Amino acid sequence: MKFLKNIKSLEFRLAESMLKSINDLKEKYLAFSDEELKNMTNVFKEKLKKNVSLESIRIDAFAVAREATFRVLKKRPYDVQMIGGLILDFGSVAEMKTGEGKTITSIAPVYLNALKGSGVIVSTVNEYLAERDAAEMGEVFKWLGLSVGLNKANMPSNLKRAAYKCDITYSVHSELGFDYLRDNMVNSFEEKVQRDLNFALIDEVDSILIDEAKTPLIISGGKSDEVSLYAVTDQFVRTLDHVDYAIDEETKAINLTAQGIEKTKKFFNFNSLYNLENSELIHRLQNALRAHKVMKKDVEYVVLNGKIELVDTFTGRIMEGRSYSEGLQQAIQAKELVEIDPETKTLATITYQNFFRLFKKLSGMTGTGKTEEQEFIDIYNMRVTEIPTNVPIARIDHPEKVYVTFQAKYKAVVEEIKRLHAKKQPILVGTSQVEESEYLHQLLLKENLPHTVLNAKQNKNEADIIAKAGIAGAITIATNMAGRGTDIKPDAESLKQGGLFVLGTDKSEARRIDNQLKGRSGRQGDVGESRFFISIDDQLIRRFSLQDKWKEIFAEYKDNEIIDKQIKKAFDKAQRKIEGFNYDNRKNVLNYDDVIRQQRDIIYSQRDSILLQDDLSLVVEKMIQRNSKQIIKYGELYTRTGALDHKALVNFVNKEYMNICDFKFTLEDFNNYINEEIPQHLSNILIREYRKMREFLVEKSGKLPTNLFERRAIISALDEKWQNHINLMDKLRQSVNLVQYSQKNPFQTYTEIGTKHFEQLVEDIATNSLKIIMNNPSAKFQNLDGDFKNEQIKLEDGSIITIPANIPFDIKEQIISKAKELLKESGEKRKVFEKNILSDLNLVDEKFRDSSKW
């Protein structure tokens, strides 16, 4: 274990000592028969039932998992892989170089944590990896007696629920978040697919928790805005000159100059541009400015088949099904003269940062995470531990070559490719942008050099293309980390020529991304090489307005390489500065999102409480008490002199709450009360009438249908108001920076206004819930003579479904809709449905508990 001598990490030293204990058990479990080894899972579970901690069985569980991996996959995890697994079980990030077998490393910690029966989720960056790992690693877990599930997009709810109920669930990261949001939009608790978020192990953790940290997961609904405003602001922005706006190259922020503001005021006929009344227009204008002057085609997005497709700037892949939110997507559509989609309304949203922080325990694997350790600690409370390679790295990382111009750089790149190709050494060229990969593609065509291009426009058979990049003579151009997760294995001939040569055409915004590109070469001790070619024209230098200065200093070099340590230090300094800025930006996003997170936690908790309660009468009565205090605050109930208008109060309460009740408020009900006493008096009467109505409904329909109606009334009001609140907070977030002009703190203002909005949200939920409950259509029978009558519904095929009158009014349409769906089903299934509908009330009620069983 000489390679461990220099490791100083406390976690690593702890893992090293545990590794010795694990190795000491090798002979013990090697002597076990297959059945004896499999039975250890039951032994561990029995110990856990007796409140033995996971930590106390960790050593044995890891040793068992190691032996099982060998027997099933014929691969015995290396010592460094076991150490990596221990780091993961500590709830930290294990940094393992590319090709070191992170997937095998995950087996032991996943096995150990799955023994509790609370569920373990393994999150991957795409569905291909989720399917692959669930199949391959799943063999080991199933052999050991654990169940393995695969969660995919567009799966039916029942299959998703089954996948999450497994001991171990593999899933792409985005679907985990969307399932969480959808679970908090269901109408019954039984419809949820996820269980408690216990332990998540994230593969490529830096990609998900760092690169995609700012990207919110959004479930959208109905249209919220007209498209005309996008067209108008787009037309206006096209008239602007470069003196009308200013771009901060460092932060990519864009704002109108004083001249631009005057031009805007004149165009839109405003006296004052920056006030909250004009915030909607300013928001659209900012999006149009950003779309035209900051967002670059073939960099952040591409246009394919008349559609705007987003490009992951870190991988170069198209992000399927993703779009910019808050109107930026529509602004880009207007810019590119494609059809403008109506902006959708946000129904639910959460960032990856806040979703994964919901897990009780979190860990992750990556090839490059140490440079972002402070962010992992600050936001996720996860340390990053570097795991040594099993075999020393043999790759040679050559110093970068720097050129004055973009053209000179690519001229040198082509010459280098020609030199390497002449001796059949395989080359992987990494570019940061689609347009650069296309540019190099044209240059290589002119030189008659056979090559393959992999970018957002050319991404078919990605894994296959990347896998073949190690064949002797292969030239592969890929945007950044396309093909991440797929091994590049050089053949024997290419290894003789020096192995895979990774050629980077510019430095990225993070050293981590550059290290990922280098890591494609030299896996498991293979030989390999890497070198970066960079120029003063590169975005890294342009962002800090250093381009002209450096070009003037080094003009004498023309097309030749710049030999100067100062310029290389400038690139390193710029890269570190951008890393810091991006971290601050992600932390700022988290601060704002934490305001919504706290509110979301309250709403979702209340929502679950409503779904789980069998009797909501106390909840309704508390709403009545709360609402009664709010009613007399309504301004329209007061005269010009400020006195409470009792007549207006009577009319308002009767109209909103007493439509179907025998009782009606009169002036006499309030004349003998002072204003301070009215809320309590009003509350007492409303509760009395509510109890009478509920008693009637329970007697006629049963407790379950009555509670079901009340539950749906409250959930409906809660969902509607919460969705409105989310969109209101979105708009506030976009416009709040305007308060800087009045010397106010935007975040403080956002928090204060957001809190007031949330307090109003709570009141509005109670108000709307009561309006529905107190006007329950089923209660209209209270004022009629005679018995309930069953209703017969004739379906399209002529058959008749009989619906008992004691079925709550609000779900009758859902029953009919489901019946129509069943027209396509077998006759036997329809008979079961009709039998249940016509059976005694208890059976009907049971069916209503879970509409997915209808």
Swiss-Prot record:
Recorded hits in CDD domains, A to Z, give:
DEXDc_SecA, SF2_C_secA
What is a single Pfam family found in this protein's UniProt entry?
SecA_SW
What's the main place this protein lives? membrane
Top enzyme class of this protein? translocase
Q: Which InterPro entries match?
A: Helicase_ATP-bd, Helicase_C-like, P-loop_NTPase, SecA, SecA_DEAD, SecA_motor_DEAD, SecA_preprotein_X-link_dom, SecA_SF2_C
The EC number(s) this enzyme carries: 7.4.2.8
Localization terms from the record: Cell membrane; Cytoplasm
Membrane topology, record value: Peripheral membrane protein
- For this protein, what reaction is catalysed? ATP + H2O + cellular proteinSide 1 = ADP + phosphate + cellular proteinSide 2
- Keywords in alphabetical order, please: ATP-binding, Cell membrane, Cytoplasm, Membrane, Nucleotide-binding, Protein transport, Translocase, Translocation, Transport
| Molecular function per GO | ATP binding; protein-exporting ATPase activity
Q: What would be one Gene Ontology cellular-component term for the protein?
A: cell envelope Sec protein transport complex
Q: Which residues bind ATP?
A: 81, 99-103, 487
> What processes does the entry annotate via GO biological process terms?
intracellular protein transmembrane transport; protein import; protein targeting; protein transport by the Sec complex
Quaternary assembly: Monomer and homodimer. Part of the essential Sec protein translocation apparatus which comprises SecA, SecYEG and auxiliary proteins SecDF. Other proteins may also be involved.
Please report which protein family the annotation says this sequence is part of. Belongs to the SecA family.
Which PANTHER family does the annotation name? CHLOROPLAST PROTEIN-TRANSPORTING ATPASE (PTHR30612:SF0), SECA INNER MEMBRANE COMPONENT OF SEC PROTEIN SECRETION SYSTEM (PTHR30612)
Function summary: Part of the Sec protein translocase complex. Interacts with the SecYEG preprotein conducting channel. Has a central role in coupling the hydrolysis of ATP to the transfer of proteins into and across the cell membrane, serving as an ATP-driven molecular motor driving the stepwise translocation of polypeptide chains across the membrane.
Q: Which HAMAP family match?
A: SecA
| Protein's recorded name | Protein translocase subunit SecA
Q: Which organism is it from?
A: Mycoplasma mobile (strain ATCC 43663 / 163K / NCTC 11711)
Which gene codes for it?
A: secA
